[in-house]
């Protein structure tokens, strides 16, 4: 916005007399040019035209996929189709039973079977595909739950078995330790008994030696005491014994002298033993 200033020069006032009109025309031209693409010669793109076309086509495909996704989201798990602002159109009980029976035959939906089911049940093929997709998801979830329950039961069973095995192992270890202690105690008892028997044997041997030596000593002591008590009788008995022994010696010497005299008077061949053959022949002649 321009304000009139009387102090400015006249030339400046003339140049700025119609500035708003030129600005307005330029703004209108720019507004009209926004709706149109700039016209540039093709050689300036250097092959970029195909890229721009492909990009525009990809954007269109993304938009169509998004719309299709929205349409699929409008379908419920039971295949009911809901439009914006409309209520769900639920499937009939017969349709659900037929779809369940077909799913039991095979959870994978082929294009031909999808079309046949759509015609037979009066449904759209897209509804059939979405129902099968949701049904497979529920089936997988239930299968995972069943597998989880089965694995959990197996885990609990293995856990209890492991606990029982650990308890049994502890029991066996306790029994082994008790047996080892018992063997050690028995070995110590046997060792003590052997040592005691050895000590007893040594004491008995020593006592027997002592007992054997004691009678000899007692006999000699008794003899000495008897000699001391009866010295005359012991001497007379000893004298008689000596006289008897001397008499026997004299008799033996007289006998020896007698035999020696006979040996000297008789010839040597008289005492020779007769020949057994001679006696035998003499017996035959008799």
UniProtKB/Swiss-Prot annotation:
GO BP of this protein: response to auxin
CC annotations in GO: nucleus
Main location: nucleus
Pfam families found in the cross-reference section: HALZ, Homeodomain
GO molecular function: DNA-binding transcription factor activity; DNA-binding transcription factor activity, RNA polymerase II-specific; sequence-specific DNA binding
SUPFAM superfamilies: Homeodomain-like
Transmembrane segments: none
Subcellular location field: Nucleus
Induction (UniProt): By auxin.
Family label: Belongs to the HD-ZIP homeobox family. Class I subfamily.
Name under which the protein is recorded: Homeobox-leucine zipper protein ATHB-20
Organism: Arabidopsis thaliana (Mouse-ear cress)
Gene designation: ATHB-20
């Amino acid at each position: 916005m321009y304000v009139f200033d009387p102090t400015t020069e006249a030339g400046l006032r003339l140049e700025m007399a119609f500035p708003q009109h030129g600005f307005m025309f330029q703004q209108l031209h720019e507004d009209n040019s926004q709706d149109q693409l700039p016209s540039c010669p093709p050689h300036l793109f250097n092959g970029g035209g195909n890229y721009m076309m492909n990009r525009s086509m990809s954007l269109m495909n993304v938009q169509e996929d998004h719309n299709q996704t929205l349409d699929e989201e409008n379908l419920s798990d039971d295949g009911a189709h809901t439009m914006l602002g409309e209520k769900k159109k639920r499937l009939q009980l017969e349709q659900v039973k037929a779809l369940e029976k077909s799913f039991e035959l095979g959870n994978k939906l082929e294009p031909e079977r999808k079309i046949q089911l759509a015609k037979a049940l009066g449904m759209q093929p897209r509804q059939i595909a979405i129902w099968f997709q949701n049904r497979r998801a529920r089936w997988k979830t239930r299968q995972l739950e069943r597998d989880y329950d089965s694995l959990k039961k197996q885990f609990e069973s293995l856990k209890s078995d492991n606990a029982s095995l650990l308890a049994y192992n502890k029991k066996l270890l306790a029994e082994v330790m008790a047996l080892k202690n018992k063997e050690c105690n028995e070995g110590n008892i046997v060792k003590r008994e052997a040592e005691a028997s050895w000590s007893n044997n040594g004491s008995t041997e020593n006592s027997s030696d002592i007992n054997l030596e004691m009678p000899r000593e007692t006999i000699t002591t008794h003899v000495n005491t008897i000699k001391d008590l009866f010295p005359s009788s012991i001497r007379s008995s000893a004298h008689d014994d000596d006289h008897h022994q001397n008499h026997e010696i004299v008799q033996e010497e007289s006998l020896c002298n007698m035999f020696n005299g006979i040996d000297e008077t008789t010839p040597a061949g008289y005492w020779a033993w007769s020949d057994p053959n001679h006696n035998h022949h003499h017996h035959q002649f008799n």
